[in-house]
């Protein structure tokens, strides 16, 4: 560490494992932006399920140890690299990825993963945009290629990605069905664009969905927990229906004939494999949503930086999501 280099507090992970492997350190060097990089003073950072998969070592992405978790930050630009022209010190911004990790007082990001945060949205809302909204937009507009008038079912609709999917689907003229596991979660789903909501903890909730949509079935299913729901999803689809897998925590056995008889398809999405061109298209759609007003993140539990391990426990084991989980700095 260079003499006189400024320090910050940050969560550090020295080995893959449970939430307890995350340690708060106060002697981490503040990164210095190079070329096309932006240094952001972090005001809030989103906590995503993918953060827990990466931390546990079960995700395809395995950062070099030690590392700082966190991809979605919102804050103020502190400094920029010499080749950055789109941002300047003092700008309010949010990110869809970071280079140095977002569970920290400062975060470094490539300038093409940084976006201006409108004044109408606060920093907590800004930290809830990145992965949830870009993922939902990718799933609905690029992978499912939804059309106005289609029926979409969003599993886990009360979480960050789920709420984003509800808002986007409603804005694009779809009939929106959602599932959630608590009364509070169901109310949030209805408040954010769903026409109907179903309690996935009820034994007969699949039958209720079938009754609601009738013989036609569902055109698109946005699936957050494929290892639990995928087999049922295939039976709910219309002819030519699509299941878009956003999340899964393990394997599941399905009958391929369920796809053959309806000409249906299963497609997985992973935001980190998207091209720069796709990110630009997603960003344009979401910026329009901010301007018009349908993009309005819902904030769930809020934790201080030192409670990051508790946040990771809660995002996996909570009874039901109620908005986006945030670390507030």
From Swiss-Prot:
Q: How does it assemble?
A: Homotetramer.
Q: Which gene encodes it?
A: CRYZ
**Pfam families to which the protein is assigned, alphabetical:** ADH_N, ADH_zinc_N
**Gene Ontology MF terms:** mRNA 3'-UTR binding; NADPH binding; NADPH:quinone reductase activity; zinc ion binding
The organism named in the record is: Sus scrofa
Positions contributing to NADP(+) binding: 53, 158-161, 181, 200, 229, 246-249, 269-271
Entry protein name: Quinone oxidoreductase
For this protein, the record's PROSITE patterns field holds:
QOR_ZETA_CRYSTAL
Instruction: Spell out the SUPFAM superfamilies in the cross-references.
Output: GroES-like, NAD(P)-binding Rossmann-fold domains
The catalytic activity of this protein is classed by the Enzyme Commission as: 1.6.5.5
Q: Which residues carry this modification: N-acetylalanine?
A: 2
Q: What does this protein do?
A: Does not have alcohol dehydrogenase activity. Binds NADP and acts through a one-electron transfer process. Orthoquinones, such as 1,2-naphthoquinone or 9,10-phenanthrenequinone, are the best substrates (in vitro). May act in the detoxification of xenobiotics. Interacts with (AU)-rich elements (ARE) in the 3'-UTR of target mRNA species and enhances their stability. NADPH binding interferes with mRNA binding.
PTM N6-acetyllysine: list the residues. Answer: 23
């Amino acid at each position: 560490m260079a003499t006189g280099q400024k320090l910050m507090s940050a969560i550090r992970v020295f080995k893959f494992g449970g939430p307890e492997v995350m340690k708060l350190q106060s002697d981490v060097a503040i990164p210095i932006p190079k070329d096309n990089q932006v240094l952001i003073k972090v005001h809030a950072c989103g906590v995503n399920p993918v953060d827990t998969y990466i931390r546990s070592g079960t995700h395809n992405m395995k950062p070099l140890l030690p590392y700082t978790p966190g991809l979605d930050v919102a804050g103020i630009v502190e400094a920029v690299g010499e080749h950055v022209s789109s941002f300047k010190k003092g700008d309010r911004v949010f990110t869809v990825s970071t280079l140095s990790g977002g569970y920290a007082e400062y975060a470094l990001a490539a300038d093409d993963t940084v976006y201006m945060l409108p004044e109408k949205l606060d920093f907590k809302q800004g930290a809830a945009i990145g992965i949830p909204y870009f993922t939902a937009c990718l799933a609905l507009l690029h992978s499912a290629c939804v059309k106005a008038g289609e029926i979409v079912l969003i599993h886990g609709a009360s979480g960050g990605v789920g709420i984003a999917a509800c808002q986007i689907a409603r804005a694009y003229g779809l009939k929106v069905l959602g599932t959630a596991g608590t009364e509070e979660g169901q109310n949030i789903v209805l408040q954010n664009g769903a026409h109907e909501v179903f309690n996935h903890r009820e034994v007969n909730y699949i039958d209720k969905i079938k009754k609601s949509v009738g013989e036609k079935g569902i055109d698109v299913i946005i699936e957050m927990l494929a290892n639990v729901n995928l087999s049922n999803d295939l039976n709910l689809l219309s002819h030519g229906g699509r299941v878009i897998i956003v999340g899964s925590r393990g394997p599941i056995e399905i009958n391929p004939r369920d796809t053959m008889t309806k000409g249906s398809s299963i497609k997985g999405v992973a935001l980190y494999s998207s091209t720069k061109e796709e990110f630009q298209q997603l960003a344009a759609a979401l910026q329009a949503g901010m301007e018009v007003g349908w993009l309005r993140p819902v904030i769930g539990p809020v934790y201080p930086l030192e409670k990051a391990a508790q946040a990771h426990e809660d995002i996996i084991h909570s009874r039901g999501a109620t908005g986006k989980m945030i670390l507030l700095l």
